[in-house]
Amino acid sequence: NNTVDNIEALFKVAKEKGITVFVSPHYYYKHDLNWEFEGSLETLMHKITMFDRKGALTQEGFEGSGADWLDKYKKYIDGENVIVTSPHKLYGPESNDLALQLRKHGYSKVVLAGMSANLCTESHMRDLVESGFNVSVVKDATAAAILPGLNGYEAALVNFRMIASHVFTTEEVVIEL
């Protein structure tokens, strides 16, 4: 559904309009790889070093790693209107400072997009709604795994429609902003 380009379109319009963007990164450090238990997807992410970083206080090995930003997003994330929160560890923002940053900057409305619809995006939506935020989701600026008998994207769309204040397309958000 053109997720990567649609997320870029959201970054672009936010930059043009001076809208603050909050990025909730997913990082694992060495100590995270020694957990006594984990879910099947966590096991996979750890095995393929999907979001691994050398440490919280170093950029060593970050460039080009699974934790690095997509090249087309770097010019936006390095911009003045972007706040990168502390990392989340599983799927939602319960383990980072996203809600704190939103509140401290005076935001009560969130337009949510992200790479993993039924995991990180949905978990962020649920937690932010439960924390009192007015959350809308951009349904074509997120995607999910589709496997035999498992359609993560369709599952997420059902929950977006049931929980979010509004479900937009990228085109609708760009026009609305």
Please tell me what each predicted stretch does.
Residues 2-20:
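A short, N-terminal amphipathic alpha-helix
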Residues 29-33:
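Short catalytic/ligand-binding loop motif for oxyanion handling, primarily in non-cytosolic enzymes
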Residues 26-28, 124:
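Histidine-centered active-site/metal-ligand motif
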Residues 19-26, 138:
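Short beta-strand segments at enzyme active-site cores
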Residues 13-17, 34-35, 40-177:
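Active-site-adjacent betaalpha module
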